[in-house]
Amino acid sequence: MIALFRRSCGVLRSLSHFDWRSQHTKTALQREPGSGFSFEFTEQQKEFQATARKFAREEIIPLAAEYDKTGEYPVPLIKRAWELGLMNTHIPESCGGLGLGTFDSCLISEELAYGCTGVQTAIEANSLGQMPVIIAGNDQQQKKYLGRMTEEPLMCAYCVTEPVAGSDVAGIKTKAEKKGDEYIINGQKMWITNGGKANWYFLLARSDPDPKAPASKAFTGFIVEADTPGVQIGRKELNMGQRCSDTRGIVFEDVRVPKENVLIGEGAGFKIAMGAFDKTRPPVAAAAVGLAQRALDEATKYALERKTFGKLLIEHQGISFLLAEMAMKVELARLSYQRAAWEVDSGRRNTYYASIAKAYAGDIANQLASDAVQIFGGNGFNTEYPVEKLMRDAKIYQIYEGTAQIQRLIIAREHIGRYKK
């Protein structure tokens, strides 16, 4: 284990000449709100960004099309990301992790998504699965389930969505019945990213049998090990985009979970599940920006090479204006996720900004992918060119971790509350 740890650090230093695990300081967490405004990254942030960019462009991009075609889970790339310190960045230092802030994680997410959002989603899904344990787990739970992920490249999953309960989280039917020192869990989950690869799950289940019980008291959050008897993992789903990520349904049949695996206590699950999103939505928005930036870059490169009507595409005002609009949207979306990340790292409630970032970045990722296909013309509709994959990959950003419509409900609620104050 120690040898592996040292070898991982050596690989990272060889790329960026920086030892994350020994020299990390919580810059974002130490910054006082209002202490000064700056767009300058710290040297550490620049190093993380450079490492992620190098990995994405030299190792992910050359393999992305093949993984998209086969749907194979990108195990070698995930192991490599883990070796480079680009996975599990939220894990606290007390558990052997880097303890990075959300802003730092966003910088990494954007760069990885530029290479392939399928690969990036497989990596980032770990953060979503870990976050309930990070924000609500006790020391024993954190060291047991987060600590092991710093020792080897293990995966976990956020197990909440059900076949008839997506956006309506309060409508989930999976039940947890307490019997002695255990809970017996029965139910079905759906669209679980990393579902077939996870070592353990964060599971949300109804523990109060009263159907009228409020969501804030009716649900409990559990840590469930994937090899527990009664856990039945479904087939890998064939999705429109992000095909190399692992998405499955999971059935829980008389699954026994010890009370020690309850997060905080009975009835606290809904708040934990929702609270995780304030920290995970900014990196999802950042990933959408990474895809949008890739679409802009591919379209710009093509417009500088392709000739029509006797001149380059870029020399046609209609194309140049379209590229200008695309560039504007990328920059605005990037600022939105950075604001959301800065807010939560500064200790502020960032629900409003996180939803704005998630909604806007998801929308512009779809718009820019479509615009890139349009600039490529017929070539853009063909798998020999990269932009058709971007268009397929982009759609999920308007769906997972809260749909575009749910984000607007949250934004409206938060906005009205602010106005009334």
UniProtKB/Swiss-Prot annotation:
UniProt catalytic activity: a medium-chain 2,3-saturated fatty acyl-CoA + oxidized [electron-transfer flavoprotein] + H(+) = a medium-chain (2E)-enoyl-CoA + reduced [electron-transfer flavoprotein]; pentanoyl-CoA + oxidized [electron-transfer flavoprotein] + H(+) = (2E)-pentenoyl-CoA + reduced [electron-transfer flavoprotein]; hexanoyl-CoA + oxidized [electron-transfer flavoprotein] + H(+) = (2E)-hexenoyl-CoA + reduced [electron-transfer flavoprotein]; octanoyl-CoA + oxidized [electron-transfer flavoprotein] + H(+) = (2E)-octenoyl-CoA + reduced [electron-transfer flavoprotein]
Keyword check for ATP-binding: no
Annotated catalytic residues: 401 (proton acceptor)
GO CC aspect terms: cytoplasm; mitochondrial matrix; mitochondrion
A Pfam entry, by short name: Acyl-CoA_dh_N
Main location: mitochondrion
Residues found modified as N6-acetyllysine: 69, 79, 212, 217, 259, 271, 279, 301
Pathway: Lipid metabolism; mitochondrial fatty acid beta-oxidation
Protein residues bound to octanoyl-CoA: 167, 216, 278, 281, 349, 351, 401
Its biological purpose: Medium-chain specific acyl-CoA dehydrogenase is one of the acyl-CoA dehydrogenases that catalyze the first step of mitochondrial fatty acid beta-oxidation, an aerobic process breaking down fatty acids into acetyl-CoA and allowing the production of energy from fats.
Subunit structure: Homotetramer. Interacts with the heterodimeric electron transfer flavoprotein ETF.
Entry's family note: Belongs to the acyl-CoA dehydrogenase family.
Protein name as annotated: Medium-chain specific acyl-CoA dehydrogenase, mitochondrial
Source lineage: Eukaryota, Metazoa, Chordata, Craniata, Vertebrata
Gene symbol of the encoding locus: ACADM
